[in-house]
Every structure is written in structure tokens, then in C-alpha cells.
Amino acid sequence: MSLLTEVETYVLSIVPSGPLKAEIAQRLEDVFAGKNTDLEALMEWLKTRPILSPLTKGILGFVFTLTVPSERGLQRRRFVQNALNGNGDPNNMDRAVKLYRKLKREITFHGAKEIALSYSAGALASCMGLIYNRMGAVTTEVAFGLVCATCEQIADSQHRSHRQMVATTNPLIRHENRMVLASTTAKAMEQMAGSSEQAAEAMEIASQARQMVQAMRAIGTHPSSSAGLKDDLLENLQTYQKRMGVQMQRFK
């Protein structure tokens, strides 16, 4: 796996699923391929994206700044600086300085990542902030190692939280989660259907599913009534795709 592929993998692991994730993936691919060289426009686009947490925006801004060639005098962006200040916690800053001293002696991506993984996400973000604000200088490989370690820490905590929700025995939470998944699946179906003539059927199925979820929420239904909702939708989607000549078995 190439270095940039690894960086893209780690960064995308902390972005919530949805159309925006696909857009960010495309931007990262363009940046890493050298196709997008307007850093200022890229940062302005990132700043105005909805849904993303300030820290995720900060990390993406850091990656774009590391990768896109820019004039030396280009101003640092406040939204990135604020996200990478470790919540203003002096302990995070102290640890970030210690980590930075270790990283300065390191030259490889994997070496930097190994060192960084023993620090908290707050300290790692602060260390990125030091480098972003030009208070510290490390090689691009080392900076990418720091980025990937930070993303791994964040993805780990997201995974723990997700696992807790999936494993919960509370029927109300499970019911709502199934309805949310069915609703997002329906949205994805509508987007994939696009504007082709054969798309009407898929759009109709998706629209009915969303209306059903809205009705279930409005009237309040038994927690078991949502069982199988998402799977039924996915079966319909796969039937539609086969007719369109698309074989995708990876949704479930």
C-alpha cells in the first residue's frame, strides 16, 4: 500500500458515511494525484462543509496544506488552528511539545506513527497544530504518520461507541437505529438511481420506504416493527441493479 493510499484510508475512516464522504474522497484523490492545486479554494470549500466536526475539518485542512504546493506566505486558516489547539488544555500542549521533539528525530512514516500512537488524540491534535502554525518542522512523511495515528485513535473510539450501540439490548434504540439505516439506504438508492429511464422503480421503492419510516415515527410503532426493513430495501436495490447489469453484493 502506498503512503498516500494509507493516508487516504485513515483520514476517510473518521468521516461520517454519506454523500459528503464521497465528495471528500474525490478531493483527496485529486489532491494526491496533483490535480487540485488551488489550496485557498480547497480550504474555503472545506470550511463551509456541514456535518464534519471541527477536529475532522482541522485534520483534513492539515492534510491539504501538507500536500498542495502553495506560496510560502499563504495565511494559515483560523478554523484549522482552532481545531488543532488540543481544546486549549495546557497538558495537551506539554505532551505535544514532548512528542514533537521525538518526531523531529524520526524520518519514516511508520516510525512516526508508532511513536504517536502512545499519545492521546488531544496531544496529537496539538502537535499537528504546532506543525501547522510553523512552530515546528518535520518531514512530510513524519507529519503523515502523525495524521494517521490521530485518525486511528479517533476511529477506535468511534468504533467502540458504534459497537456499544449495535450491541445494546434496548429495543427502542435498536428500533430507531433500524429506521435510520433504512432511511439512509433509501437516500442512497435515490442517488444511485440517477436519471435513467429504468430508475423510476428504484425511486418509487426508496420513496415508499422513507414515507413508511416517517409514518412509523409519527404514530409510534412497536419496536419490532422495523425488523428487516433495511434488508428488504437492499434486496430491492440488488434486484434493480441486476436488471441494470450492475453486480454489487457488498451492501449487506
Swiss-Prot record:
The keyword RNA-binding applies. It is found in: Virion membrane; Host nucleus. Residues 1-164 are annotated as: Membrane-binding. Keywords: Host nucleus, Membrane, RNA-binding, Viral matrix protein, Virion. One of its GO terms (cellular component) is virion membrane. The lineage of its organism: Viruses, Riboviria, Orthornavirae, Negarnaviricota, Polyploviricotina. Belongs to the influenza viruses Matrix protein M1 family. Homodimer and homomultimer. Interacts with NEP. Binds ribonucleocapsid by both interacting with genomic RNA and NP protein. May interact with HA and NA. Cannot bind NP without genomic RNA. InterPro entries: Flu_matrix_M1, Flu_matrix_M1_C, Flu_matrix_M1_N, Flu_matrix_M1_N_sub1, Flu_matrix_M1_N_sub2, INFV_M1. Its main location: virion. It comes from the Viruses. Residues 165-252 are annotated as: RNP-binding. It is a peripheral membrane protein. This is Matrix protein 1. It holds the Pfam family Flu_M1_C. The keyword RNA-binding applies. Plays critical roles in virus replication, from virus entry and uncoating to assembly and budding of the virus particle. M1 binding to ribonucleocapsids (RNPs) in nucleus seems to inhibit viral transcription. Interaction of viral NEP with M1-RNP is thought to promote nuclear export of the complex, which is targeted to the virion assembly site at the apical plasma membrane in polarized epithelial cells. Interactions with NA and HA may bring M1, a non-raft-associated protein, into lipid rafts. Forms a continuous shell on the inner side of the lipid bilayer in virion, where it binds the RNP.
